Every structure is written in structure tokens, then in C-alpha cells.
Swiss-Prot record:
Region ranges (Helix-loop-helix motif): 116-127
Organism ancestry: Eukaryota, Metazoa, Chordata, Craniata, Vertebrata
Post-translational modification: Phosphorylated by MAPK1/ERK2 and MAPK3/ERK1.
Residues where Phosphoserine is found: 106, 207
Region annotation Basic motif: where it falls in the sequence: 128-193
Protein name per UniProt: Spermatogenic leucine zipper protein 1
Organism of origin: Rattus norvegicus
InterPro entries assigned: Spz1
Length: 400
């Protein structure tokens, strides 16, 4: 729209030959890194600047002018497209080529040319169109196309030269790398061999140590087994000893009980023997008195002896009475034992009386004296029996 408005307001001039055939001639190698013009919509001030003086302009001239500008714009667009394609090809290559241009410099050049082209385009719009200027423009375009061709050829030559140089440099570098690499590889190979030898030596050393450790482990296991066997044997022995100690203790306790019973029975037997000895002594005394009465005419001596015996018997009766009191007090404390002692005493007295009765002499001159002696003997035997029973009871309680 902006192009049509500007073309309608331009002044009328004689038609000039169209620049289409010369402008459409494309260069064979369009590989330039410099842009000529940024195409866009024309500014609004261009339309307003030519409004009044161009009202009397013919429509035919206006149409020719519009076609000319449209053709120029198309040519510029084609050139820019070719330039953009060539730039993409160059950027796809190696960035270290000799023909590589940094982006900063290319942007600065593009900006400078853009400004110049815009100024020229504005001058063309403000100034009336002249055929001389159009010819100059054609010549400039031709010159630019020739220069572009020359630049492309130069760029191609430079690219070829740079590739050849790079190829030569690469070959030289590869040769140098091979030489240096072979030396480096030999050094590394020697290091690897040394390391392998060291590793083999260490492996031998470790194998020896492993064998020694295995032997030590075996010896340790054997010692451990022996210690276990000894501990098990000691446990078994201790258990057997404990099991044997229990019946041995029981046997000892039984033997101690038997010994205590035997000692108690021996004490009883000793007490009975003492009683029998006393009874025998009394009988011996009685027999002496009888012999004295039978043999001697005098009656004074036996009477004296009988009086002395009566005194002795009285003293014994007193002692027996005191003992009877003590036994009575003890019998009150334990009545069951007292009853058992009475039964034993009665049995013992019966036996003693039977023995005494059988052994008594049948002939006595004084029966009263004999009766008193018998009674005393019986009392004495009963008291001795009681004493023996009391001693037996005490021994049993002490053992308990």
C-alpha cells in the first residue's frame, strides 16, 4: 500500500527503458556476506512530502514508475536471499577457516551499508526521477554485480587455498603426532610392563602369605577342638562327681545315724552293767554277812556291820529320793515319756526281782533285814533304769 501511494504522488517524466533484464541477471556465485538493504513498508512521511506538486501527473507515467520500483524491490529481495543461503553454507563449514568472518564485524558492516542504502533510497524518493540518474543507477548495479562476482571468486580461491593449507598442516601434524605418539606409547608400554611385573611379584607374596594364614587357621582350629574336648571331659567328670557325691553324702548321713544309735545303745548297756555290778556288790556283801552269822558265835559284829549297811542304804535312799523328785519334774513336762519310762521301769524291776528271788538264800535268821535289803535293791534298780531312760532321751534330742 505504501508503494502504491508513493508512486501515485510522484511527478511525471518521460518513460525510460525498464531495468528488468539487467537487474534480473543473477551472479553465478552469490556468496557475499554483506547485505544491501532491508526491505519493508515505506515510511509515511514519503507519502505526505509529495502530495501537492504532483496532482497534474499522468496516470500512464505513474504506472510505469510503480512497475520500476516493484522490479527493483524484487531484485533486491532475490539478492538478499542468495546472500542468506551463502552465509548458511559458510557457517556450516569449519569456524577456523581463513575465510571465516566473526559475527560482530559482519553485523557492523551490515549496519553501515543499511544506513547508506536507506539514505540513498530516501534521496531517490525526494528528488524527481531523471533518466541520467537511472543510468547511473544501472551502472552502479552492474559494477556491484561485477564486484560481487570478483569477491565470490576471491572467496572461492581463498577457500581452496585455506583448505589446501589446512590439509598440509593436518598431514604434518599427523606425522608429528605419530612420531611423538610412538615415543609416548613406548614409554607407556614400558611403564605397563613394569607395573605388571610388580603386580605379579605382589601376587606371589600375597599367595605365600595366604598359605601361611591358612596353616595358622588350621592350627588354631585344631587347638580350639582340643580345648573343646578338654572342657567337655571336665564337664562330664564334674557331673559324674556331683552325681556320685549325692549318694556318698546320703551314705555318710546313714552311717552317722547308725553310729549315734550304736553309741546310745552302748550308753544304755554301760548303765545296765553298772547297775548289775552294784547289785552284785550288794549280794556279795549280803553273802559275807550270812557267812559271818553262820560261822561266828558272837552276834555283835554282824549287827554292827548291818547298822553300817543300814546307814549306807539310808544315804542311798536320800540320793534316790532327790533323783526321783528331779525325774518327777521332768515327767510333768513330758507325760508320754514318763509313762513309757514307768512301763520300762516296772518291767525291769520285775526282771530284777525275779532274778533276785531265784538267787536269794532260803534260810535267814532275821527276815526283816532281808526284806528291807530286797526292797532297797528293787528301788535302786528302778532308779537306775529311770536314769538310763532319761539319758537315752537326752541323747536322742541332742542328735536331732
Amino acid at each position: 500500500m505504501a508503494d502504491s501511494d508513493s508512486s501515485s504522488e510522484m511527478p511525471a517524466h518521460s518513460p525510460s527503458p525498464s531495468p528488468i533484464p539487467c537487474a534480473k541477471q543473477k551472479p553465478p556465485n552469490t556468496g557475499i556476506t554483506i547485505s544491501l538493504l532491508e526491505i519493508g513498508s515505506l515510511p509515511t512521511f514519503c507519502c505526505s512530502s509529495f502530495s501537492e506538486p504532483n496532482n497534474n501527473m499522468c496516470p500512464i507515467r505513474k504506472q510505469g514508475k510503480v512497475q520500476k520500483f516493484s522490479n527493483l524491490l524484487k531484485d533486491v529481495k532475490d539478492v538478499l536471499k542468495n546472500i542468506a543461503g551463502f552465509e548458511e553454507k559458510t557457517t556450516d563449514g569449519d569456524p577456523f577457516d581463513d575465510t571465516y568472518i566473526p559475527e560482530d564485524l559482519s553485523e557492523l558492516n551490515i549496519r553501515g551499508f543499511d544506513k547508506r542504502n536507506k539514505l540513498r533510497f530516501k534521496d531517490d524518493l525526494f528528488i524527481h526521477f531523471d533518466p541520467e540518474r537511472e543510468n547511473t543507477m544501472r551502472q552502479e548495479m552492474l559494477f556491484k554485480s561485477h564486484s560481487a562476482k570478483n569477491m565470490v571468486q576471491k572467496f572461492a580461491r581463498d577457500l581452496c587455498n585455506s583448505e589446501e593449507k589446512r590439509g598440509c598442516d593436518g598431514v604434518q601434524l599427523n606425522a608429528k603426532r605419530r612420531r611423538t605418539g610412538s615415543v609416548h606409547i613406548r614409554g607407556e608400554y614400558r611403564k605397563l610392563r613394569n607395573n605388571m611385573e610388580q603386580l605379579l611379584q605382589e601376587a606371589d607374596h600375597w599367595s605365600k602369605q595366604h598359605n601361611e594364614l591358612s596353616e595358622l587357621m588350621r592350627s588354631y582350629q585344631e587347638c580350639h577342638k582340643e580345648i573343646k574336648d578338654i572342657v567337655d571331659c571336665s564337664r562330664v567328670c564334674s557331673q559324674t562327681q556331683n552325681n556320685n557325691e549325692v549318694p556318698s553324702k546320703q551314705k555318710l548321713e546313714e552311717q552317722v545315724k547308725k553310729l549315734s544309735q550304736d553309741t546310745h545303745s552302748l550308753h544304755l548297756i554301760a548303765a545296765l552293767l553298772e547297775n548289775e555290778c552294784q547289785i552284785l556288790q550288794q549280794r556279795v556283801d549280803i553273802l559275807r554277812e550270812l557267812h559271818l552269822h553262820e560261822a561266828g558265835p558272837g552276834h555283835e559284829k554282824p549287827l554292827q556291820t548291818s547298822g553300817e549297811q543300814d546307814k549306807k542304804c539310808g544315804e542311798q535312799d536320800k540320793k534316790c529320793g532327790e533323783q526321783d523328785k528331779k525325774c518327777g519334774e521332768q515327767d510333768k513336762k513330758c507325760p508320754k515319756l514318763a509313762e513309757a519310762e514307768k512301763m520300762d521301769g516296772s518291767k525291769h524291776t520285775m526282771k530284777t526281782t525275779e532274778g533276785t528271788i531265784t538267787r536269794k538264800p532260803k534260810i535267814f535268821r532275821c527276815p526283816n533285814d532281808c526284806l528291807t535289803k530286797k526292797a532297797r535293791n528293787n528301788r535302786f534298780n528302778a532308779r537306775v533304769a529311770k536314769k538310763s531312760l532319761v539319758g537315752k532321751r537326752r541323747t536322742i534330742s541332742s542328735f536331732r
